[in-house]
């Protein structure tokens, strides 16, 4: 009788454990791609944040007080500035860990270009921090808003307003960008058949650009449109 009771208890415990694991997996599978990307950013921040001092993280957060920027837009400055503080350290942490925007197919040449990014960052010296600029922001915001509504995917600013980018350089991307880290890393990797010259990467790693405007707005076909206007001058 005791053996029967013991066996029943073992079976019950195993069943409870199995159900708990199954429930956990169901909960994970129910997350949307946006939630998975947000969780990923939180996880890698927990994993790598101690590689930068509190003072370095404070310095990187140049857009913290820019009330006209969204949280995601502020994060773009933060991660780009962590890179600019110490490119090799960024290469060994965030750049090496990145796997693309979850729920979206990585562009052509993603793996090779990620490796070339890591190798390039390992050779770079610190750069001036990027700072927010309202004129550059409004130039970026106008194009992101109008371009997103019209379904634009490139640098063609033709249409109502926003014909001229006031900055010296511009980056444009469309996709499931719900975190600043995904914006920064996708543009740095610069995957895609039309990005063989790595134009976005070259702009973001150009030490002459110290001022930037960033806007992330809804896109008609591809969830979000990101526009970044950069300049060497404070406009």
Language model segments and positions:
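Short alpha-helical hairpin
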Residues: 47-59, 109-116
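A well-ordered secondary-structure block
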Residues: 138, 142-234
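Bacterial N-terminal signal peptides that target proteins for export
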Residues: 1-8
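A periodicity- and composition-biased signal for non-globular, repetitive helical segments
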Residues: 8-9, 90
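Bacterial Sec-dependent N-terminal signal peptides
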Residues: 16-55, 63
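Intrinsically disordered, low-complexity peptide-like regions
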Residues: 4, 20-24, 35, 131, ...
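Bacterial N-terminal signal peptides
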Residues: 9-17
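Short, well-ordered surface patches within globular domains
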Residues: 64-165, 201, 207
């Amino acid at each position: 009788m005791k053996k029967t009771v013991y066996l029943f208890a073992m079976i019950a415990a195993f069943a409870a454990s199995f159900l708990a694991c199954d429930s956990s997996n169901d909960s994970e599978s129910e997350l949307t791609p946006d939630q998975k990307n947000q969780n990923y950013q939180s996880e890698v921040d927990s994993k790598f944040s101690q590689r930068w001092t509190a003072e370095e993280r404070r310095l990187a957060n140049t857009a913290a007080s820019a009330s006209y920027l969204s949280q995601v837009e502020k994060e773009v400055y933060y991660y780009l500035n962590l890179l600019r503080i110490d490119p090799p350290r960024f290469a060994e942490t965030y750049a090496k860990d990145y796997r693309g925007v979850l729920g979206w197919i990585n562009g052509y040449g993603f793996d090779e270009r990620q490796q070339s990014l890591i190798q390039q960052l390992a050779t770079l010296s610190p750069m001036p921090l990027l700072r927010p600029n309202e004129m550059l922001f409004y130039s970026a915001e106008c194009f992101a808003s109008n371009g997103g509504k019209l379904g634009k995917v490139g640098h063609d600013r033709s249409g109502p307003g926003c014909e001229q980018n006031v900055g010296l350089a511009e980056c444009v991307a469309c996709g499931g960008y719900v975190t600043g880290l995904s914006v920064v890393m996708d543009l740095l990797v610069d995957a895609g058949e039309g990005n063989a010259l790595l134009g976005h990467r070259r702009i973001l790693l150009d030490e002459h650009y110290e001022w930037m405007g960033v806007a992330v707005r809804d896109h008609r076909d591809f969830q979000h449109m990101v526009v970044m206007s950069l300049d060497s001058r404070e406009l």
